[in-house]
Amino acid sequence: PPKAAPAAILEAARAGIGFVVCITEGVPAQDEARVFATLQRDFPKTRLLGPNCPGIISPGKCNIGITAGEIAALPTAKGPNVGIVSRSGTLTYQALYELKQRNIGVSTCVGIGGDPVPGTSF
C-alpha cells in the first residue's frame, strides 16, 4: 500500500539492502522526496528504483519487479541487442513486445517510474 511504502523502503535500507525496487503506485510526492533525501543522507549505498515502476529485467538472468519475463527476448550473441530505460510502464511493455516480435534481444530493461521524485533518474 502507498502509505506503507516509505517505511518499507527505509526498513530495507536500514537492513543493509543495497538495491530496493518499489513498484507501489500512489506514494505521495512529499513522502517520496522525504525518503529519497533520507536515503541520500543516511544510506548513500542504497539505490532506490521507483516508486511506481515496473522494475528491472535482464532476460534469462534476473527479474525484479512486475515485468512478465516472457515479454522480453533473450539477448543473442549475434545481436542485435538493446537496453531500455523508461519512465512509462506501459510503453516499456510495448517496447519489449515490439522488440521481441522483431527478434531483437534485450540485455537489460529498467523502468524507473514516472513519479515526480523518482529514486533513480535518467
Walk through the language-model features, giving the residues of each:
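Catalytic-core regions of core metabolic enzymes
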Residues: P1-F122
